[in-house]
């Protein structure tokens, strides 16, 4: 074999090894920061994750904390549990599988507290039109499993929980979408103003709901009693992100979300 061919082969082998090493190193770095996980995952430590929230809860005395990786239909919550379902897609709630509703009902009827925060949205749609499904849902695998187990039986959030979704169409638009907003609260003990990053809001609220925060006059964080427990819905998740908890931490708001329960579960299963 000519000497030049051997040298070329060695160079190619070295380049391949260097490339594979670089890819492996990049993967390790990404795994360490957690950005291989979806936004608002508690396993993610970059600004878009919620690991700071999880580790803060971990440091609390007399609190039992865990992550849930199982499908929701297998969840059997203990009485007095606060269940965080963070970074949900509002598109998946038009409608939802009946079994998902049943799981939520079991949680709150046992005295639990369900906290659902939705992905920040900057989108538009004609009022009255159904939300268009995203090509890849944050919790598609979980939803499909539940649909199959219930023979595609679905339920309306409006009919069951007394709430609907809408988008504020009257916001100014910048190059990257809508600028950050403020959410304001009149409730004693809560921060009067927090930053807000979504034009999603709740409408068609029945009388059982209490409005915790509004943005541009629209309800964006709401709470209601449900059975023996309670339900909190937030139209944005930014305020519980690592970025927000490092720059504008709101302990009073986090305390309200936790409620008085001693067991806390942070769901990871809906990220797929």
Which positions does each model-derived feature cover?
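Aromatic-Pro/Gly-enriched surface loop or interdomain linker
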Residues: 2-75
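Second-shell loop/turn segments in exported
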Residues: 39-44, 89-93, 242-244
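Stable alpha-helical elements in mature extracytoplasmic
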Residues: 49, 53, 99-103, 153, ...
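Anion (oxyanion) recognition and catalysis
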Residues: 58, 108-109, 258
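Short, flexible loop segments at the rims of nucleotide/cofactor-binding pockets, characterized by
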Residues: 61-62, 88-94, 209-213
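Short alpha-beta junction capping motif
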Residues: 80-125, 137-139, 228
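An acidic, glycine-rich "communication" segment
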Residues: 120-216
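A glycine-centered loop/beta-turn motif at secondary-structure junctions
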Residues: 201-272
